[in-house]
Curated annotation (Swiss-Prot):
GO terms for cellular component: primosome complex. Keywords: DNA replication, DNA-binding, Primosome. Homodimer. Interacts with PriA and DnaT. Component of the replication restart primosome. Primosome assembly occurs via a 'hand-off' mechanism. PriA binds to replication forks, subsequently PriB then DnaT bind; DnaT then displaces ssDNA to generate the helicase loading substrate. Residues 12-112 form the SSB domain. InterPro entries: NA-bd_OB-fold (IPR012340), Primosome_PriB/ssb (IPR000424), Prisomal_replication_PriB (IPR023646). It comes from the Bacteria. The keyword GTP-binding does not apply. It holds the Pfam family SSB_1. Transmembrane segments: none annotated. It comes from Actinobacillus pleuropneumoniae serotype 5b (strain L20). One of its GO terms (biological process) is DNA replication, synthesis of primer. GO terms for molecular function: single-stranded DNA binding. This is Replication restart protein PriB.
Length: 124
């Protein structure tokens, strides 16, 4: 993952690994420069331990993929697929001006053993 630095040379970390189920079909659009954008929703559920207590963790987050390199690969992502997403988080504003946290994916793996090789996007 990318690590950027502040002017003071302190590292700024922004990386996320989240697994879950694909909760929507992949939608495609283009930005004003003609670059394809793909997006879908990922639902995560797990049990986490915090201060020696178990708690249920749940979230639903939009996954964003930008670029031509994802055009064929996104066709493999189906509703209900179990995947692991590697990327960074960012805030998008919706049509009402409300901020929404999203994850920009850089790498996705299928968790389902029926998918060949398990990896959707090779690491660069």
């Amino acid at each position: 993952m990318n690590q950027r630095k502040l002017a003071s040379n302190s590292p700024i970390d922004n990386c996320l690994i989240l697994s879950g189920s694909v909760a929507s079909t992949v939608k495609q659009s283009q930005n004003p420069l003609g670059v394809p954008n793909y997006r879908f929703w990922l639902e995560h559920r797990s049990i986490q331990t915090e201060v020696n207590l178990e708690r249920q963790a749940w979230c639903k987050i939009q996954v964003i993929l930008n670029g031509n390199q994802f055009s064929l690969i996104t066709q493999q992502i189906k509703l209900g697929d179990k995947i692991r997403v590697y990327g960074f988080i960012h805030t998008h504003k919706d049509y009402n001006g409300l901020s929404q946290l999203v994850v920009h994916a850089e790498h996705i793996e299928f968790i389902d053993q029926e998918k060949p090789n398990g990896t959707l996007f090779p690491s660069s």
